[in-house]
């Protein structure tokens, strides 16, 4: 009879438990802290290889090192504007959930019509 090694690959199992009366991240002073992502960390999530793949798709052969940070900043500005417009459409419709059509209308407003989401 095999014993469970706790690797998480066996039958059943309870997974990670916090213990009786535990409060998760606030469990005790000596507990492991949960690190929240800062905005800078989130921008670094768009990796150099991902930017390189996008550039290759656009026909770029060589990339200067300064391009990566600039690409992240431009992408951040673009997404902020699209999200801001999408939320405006959502609020005008008195909803709390942003729909795909809100994003389509926001892109259309910026002159970037997206087809296929009607």
From Swiss-Prot:
One Gene Ontology term from the biological process aspect of the record: nucleosome assembly
Record GO terms (molecular function): DNA binding; protein heterodimerization activity; structural constituent of chromatin
Compartments, as annotated in UniProt: Nucleus; Chromosome
Gene Ontology CC terms: nucleosome; nucleus
Location of the region described as Disordered in the Swiss-Prot/TrEMBL record: 1-39
Keyword list, A-Z: Chromosome, DNA-binding, Nucleosome core, Nucleus
Domain of life (superkingdom): Eukaryota
Ranges annotated as biased composition (Gly residues): 7-22
Cited InterPro entries: CENP-T/H4_C (IPR035425), Histone-fold (IPR009072), Histone_H4 (IPR001951)
Claim: Phosphoprotein is one of the keywords in the record: no
Record's keyword annotation contains Iron: no
Description of how the protein assembles with itself and partners: The nucleosome is a histone octamer containing two molecules each of H2A, H2B, H3 and H4 assembled in one H3-H4 heterotetramer and two H2A-H2B heterodimers. The octamer wraps approximately 147 bp of DNA.
Family assignment from sequence similarity: Belongs to the histone H4 family.
Role: Core component of nucleosome. Nucleosomes wrap and compact DNA into chromatin, limiting DNA accessibility to the cellular machineries which require DNA as a template. Histones thereby play a central role in transcription regulation, DNA repair, DNA replication and chromosomal stability. DNA accessibility is regulated via a complex set of post-translational modifications of histones, also called histone code, and nucleosome remodeling.
PANTHER family recorded: HISTONE H4
The protein's name in its UniProt record: Histone H4
Organism: Entamoeba histolytica (strain ATCC 30459 / HM-1:IMSS / ABRM)
Lineage: Eukaryota, Amoebozoa, Evosea, Archamoebae, Mastigamoebida
């Amino acid at each position: 009879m095999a014993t469970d090694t706790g690797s998480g690959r066996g039958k059943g199992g309870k997974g990670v438990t916090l213990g009786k009366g535990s409060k998760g991240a606030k469990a005790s002073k000596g507990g492991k802290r949960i690190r929240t992502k800062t905005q800078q960390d989130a921008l670094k999530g768009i990796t150099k290889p991902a930017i390189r793949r996008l550039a290759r798709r656009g026909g770029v052969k060589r990339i200067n090192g300064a391009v990566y940070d600039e690409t992240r900043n431009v992408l951040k500005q673009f997404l902020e504007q699209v999200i801001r417009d999408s939320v405006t459409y959502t609020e005008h419709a008195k909803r709390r959930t942003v729909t795909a059509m809100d994003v389509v209308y926001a892109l259309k407003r910026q002159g970037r019509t997206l087809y296929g989401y009607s």
